Curated annotation (Swiss-Prot):
Its EC number is 6.1.1.9. Belongs to the class-I aminoacyl-tRNA synthetase family. ValS type 1 subfamily. A motif ('HIGH' region) lies at residues 45-55. Residues 806-879 form a coiled coil. This is Valine--tRNA ligase. ValRS has two distinct active sites: one for aminoacylation and one for editing. The misactivated threonine is translocated from the active site to the editing site. It comes from Lactobacillus acidophilus (strain ATCC 700396 / NCK56 / N2 / NCFM). ATP binds at residue 524.
């Protein structure tokens, strides 16, 4: 009664299924007001490109939670959306246009932004197709974009309110500057890596002609902006020169020697040039000493007029020319090559320039304090694993003001205008009425500013009467990587606390990074990246989802390998095959699964239903604790080991027998267990479970809306569990003996079971059909009083010893000759190892691991030899 193919084919199983779910509106919330709401908003992927394995991991966890809660009866919302990803997307589009010979400045802002929208539309469609291939049960009727009308309204509201509260301000500060993209960068957009560089040791002469001091710098091109040289307070070497003036080499400007706590007297010469416009520490020193700030570079990284004859040169070109001139003029003492960590733009790859710039900032301390205070309350955000709460607290305790303006065209335009005549600043959600007299700030907001509002802006805020906001906010869980706790998670928390007085989500579930098989981070440079869509094409979405959830723990990295994907496919194929077996063994008029009659259970039934009960309880508990790897192991062990390896095999006795009543009971049990397994696994592997569930007798249009399995008190039976475990141990022990003596399962053998006490005898007596079916005994003797035969294979299990006499199974003379030959081989191996290990040259000079390996081999050979000698003795005594 089945149309299931003999072999699991994920492409056939998954083809068209997602569209069927969409057509049935199965992804929308139930709208049942009696049900508890459960919501997750998807961490919005950037529209810069396609999804990677990290996205697949994120969403596999989220969708598993949503499907699990939906089946538990919750009113679930899984809200989709994407991020405009300002700098990242603009950089991609600019690179594309450059290949076409186009420049955004020549195109103009409006035309360029239209090009970016076209890019967004293209990649949004790609991302949605990838979501569908992953099987994500997203409610597309609520899809959001960080630049859509509703979110733009929320962004303006937040900016204006923070400005009016004095928490947003405009000022000059040192920021990370990308000279290629000509914009400020947030810290997360700066990648630090080791570069070859140099310390340039330069003479700074005293203005009174009394000599010079030696200054070491890695960026001599910034010396045009030097306004002081600093020493550590109280440094005895320099106490007599503090207050004196120096002449800036090649420039001629006089600068003072000052004392400041920023200087480390142990580092270098203990003298530091201070360039307030080009170094964050120097900026603070300059503020403390009221030093002038001199910016020496243009936006594109070329030198400005402050650099004199070097004006117009690229900063690195200037460095080379300046060092040459310093040498010719006698100011250069030496050049000391070094390797040092230098910040690079994540997007353009160029060295970032610390640079003074007028930017918009968020005053962070008051907002961070709210987060710290909330984490002490009952309404705190729970972190899984818990240790990452300390990461959040650390960032909030050591927070700096957040630069939120970006010199880009793609993004939320800052809602600030400057009066053309008076220079007055106006900040508002709407433009000034006399707009002709005002000019809007050309900058846009940092992408993180809008994504920080994601959990509540997607629910209709600032309209607090919006039905979605009232029902589904705060959300229940955020699933993301531990690497963006500061850059995104913390910002969502403080914005939500400030504007809604609520935490944005109850739980933050963190995962690590997906690495390659060798443990390396996946990257373009290594060429080890994996496209999740390629994996799905080969193995199916269910196998990828199973891999991503099974065997992983919250907060831990995982390694991708095709060996693991093979194992995932094999497990699903096992479920496919056992489902096919069960369905094929059902009668034509089989009814949907219903609660079985436990009074008719035999031992195997009592055992499997107790194991099923335990598995359902554990998987449900572990899902609730976000321990998906542990839940996967519980499910795997039950399905593969208990159900497939044992209960199915035991059931074949009844299914192939003549007792129609017993056969019917087994069929009812099998359909119930299979139904429960498919429901249990549906949140992780939605496609195959839907296909299999619809192929068996069922009620309802989709397994997605079926109820999740629950435990039943009447299925609990620890006695049956223990008794069946004993029976299984007996069967496994005899099977192992058969393998050791090469006795095929078709042959009959004598089996003697010596019980520690007779309490377990009834287990074997009452299940003699199963014992005979699995063990094929010629003669079975069970007693507490059995003497071990002289020639026998023995196995010891809890509660019993098992003997299989070998007299009729082996030719004693042939076996003896074989064993003596094996003993000679092992003696030779032991002698070889002894000789090698007694060689002092080998022991003293070979790597420790090699020596230890040799010792392990010798111990293994000695152990094998001992067993062979015992076998020889037994054979001799049997003659």
């Amino acid at each position: 009664m089945t149309d299931l193919a003999p072999k699991y084919n994920p492409n056939e199983v998954e083809k068209g299924r997602y569209q069927e779910w969409l057509d049935e509106d199965l992804f929308k919330p139930s709208g049942d007001k009696k049900a508890h709401p459960y919501s997750i908003v998807i961490p919005p992927p950037n529209v810069t490109g396609k999804l990677h394995l990290g996205h697949a991991w994120d969403t596999a966890i989220q969708d598993t939670l949503i499907r699990f809660k939906r089946m538990e009866g919750y009113d679930t919302l899984y809200l989709p959306g994407m991020d405009h990803a300002g700098i990242a997307t603009q950089a991609k589009v600019e690179a594309k246009l450059r290949k076409q010979g186009k420049d955004r400045h020549e195109m103009g802002r409006e035309a360029f932004v239209k090009q970016v929208w076209d890019w967004k539309d293209e990649y949004a469609n790609i991302i949605k197709s990838q979501w569908s291939k992953l099987g994500l049960s997203l409610d597309y009727s609520r899809e959001r974009f960080t630049l859509d009308k509703g979110l733009s309204k929320a962004v303006k509201k937040v900016f204006v309110q923070l400005y009016n509260e004095g928490l947003i301000y405009r000022g000059e500060y040192i920021i990370n500057w990308d000279p290629t993209l000509e914009t400020a960068l947030s810290d997360i957009e700066v990648i630090h890596k080791d570069d070859k560089g140099a310390f340039y040791h330069v003479k700074y002469p005293f203005a009174d002609g009394s000599g010079f001091v030696e200054i070491a710098t890695t960026r001599p091109e910034t010396m045009f902006g030097d306004t002081a040289v600093a020493v550590a307070p109280g440094d005895p070497r320099y106490k007599d020169i503090v207050g004196k003036e120096l002449i800036l080499p090649l420039v001629g400007r006089h600068i003072p020697i000052i004392e400041d706590q920023h200087v480390d007297p142990e580092f270098g010469t203990g003298l530091v040039k201070i360039t307030p416009a080009h170094d964050p520490n120097d900026f603070q020193v300059g503020n403390r000493h009221n030093l002038k700030r001199i910016n020496v570079m243009n936006d594109d990284g070329t030198m400005n007029e402050e650099a004199g004859k070097y004006a117009g040169m690229d900063r690195f070109e200037c460095r080379e020319a300046l060092v040459k001139d310093l040498k010719e003029e006698g100011y250069l003492i030496k050049v000391e090559p070094i390797v040092h960590s230098v910040g690079h733009s994540e997007r353009s790859g160029v060295q970032v320039e610390p640079r003074l710039s007028k930017q918009w900032f968020v005053k962070m301390k008051p907002l961070a304090d709210k987060v710290l205070e909330n984490q002490k309350s009952e309404g705190k955000v729970n972190f899984v694993p818990e240790r990452f709460e300390q990461t959040l607290n650390h960032w909030m305790e050591n927070v700096h003001d957040w630069v939120i303006s970006r010199q880009l065209w793609w993004g939320h335009r800052i809602p600030a205008w400057y009066n053309k005549k008076t220079g007055e600043t106006y900040v508002g959600e709407e433009a000034p009425k006399d707009i002709e007299n005002w000019e809007q700030d050309p900058d846009v907001l940092d992408t993180w500013f809008s994504s920080a509002l994601w959990p509540f802006s997607t629910m209709g805020w600032p309209d607090t009467d919006n039905p979605d906001f009232k029902r589904y906010f705060p959300t229940n869980a955020l699933v993301t990587g531990y690497d963006i706790i500061f850059f995104w998670v913390s910002r969502m928390i403080f914005q939500s606390l400030h504007f809604t007085k609520e935490r944005p989500f109850k739980d933050v579930v963190l995962h690590g990074l997906i690495r390659d098989e060798q443990g390396r981070k996946m990257s373009k440079s290594l060429g080890n990246g994996i496209d999740p869509m390629d994996v799905i094409d080969k193995y199916g979405a269910d196998a990828l989802r199973w891999f991503l959830l099974n065997g992983t723990a919250p907060g831990q990295d995982t390694r991708f390998s095709y060996t693991k994907m093979d194992a995932a496919w094999n497990f699903i194929n096992k479920i496919w095959n056992v489902s096919r077996f069960v369905i094929m063994n059902l009668p034509e008029d089989a009814k949907p699964a219903h609660m079985p009659d436990t009074s008719k259970f035999d031992l195997s039934d009592k055992w499997i239903f107790d194991r099923l009960n335990h598995t359902i309880g554990e998987v449900t508990r572990l899902f609730g604790e976000y321990q998906f790897g542990e839940a996967g192991r519980e499910a795997y062990n039950f399905i593969w080991n208990d159900f497939c390896d044992w209960y199915i095999e035991i059931s074949k006795v009844a299914l192939n027998g003549d007792d129609e009543e017993l056969k019917a009971r087994k069929q009812e049990n099998l359909i119930w267990i299979l139904d429960q397994i498919l429901r249990l696994m549906h949140p992780i592997m939605p496609f195959v479970t839907e296909k299999l569930w619809l192929s068996m007798p069922h009620e309802g249009k989709s397994i997605m809306t079926a109820s999740y399995p629950v435990t039943h008190k009447e299925f609990e039976n620890k006695t049956a569990d223990q008794e069946m475990d004993f029976l299984i141990e007996v069967i496994k022990a005899v099977r192992n003996i058969r393998m050791e003596v090469n006795a095929p399962m078709s042959s009959e053998i004598d089996i003697m079971i010596k019980l520690d006490d007779l309490n377990n005898k009834h287990i074997l007596d009452e299940n003699v059909d199963y014992v005979e079916n699995f063990l094929h005994p010629k003669k079975l003797e069970v007693s507490a009083d059995i003497e071990a035969p002289k020639l026998a294979k023995t196995a010891v299990i809890p509660g019993a010893q098992i003997f299989v006499p070998l007299t009729e199974l082996v030719n004693v003379d042939e076996e003896l000759a074989k064993m003596e030959k094996e003993a000679k081989r092992l003696e030779d191996e032991v002698a070889r190892c002894e000789k090698k290990l007694s060689n002092k040259g080998f022991v003293d000079h070979a790597p420790e691991a090699v020596v230890n390996k040799e010792k392990e081999k010798m111990a293994d050979y000695e152990s094998q030899l001992s067993g062979v000698r015992e076998r020889i003795q037994d054979l001799k005594e049997s003659k």
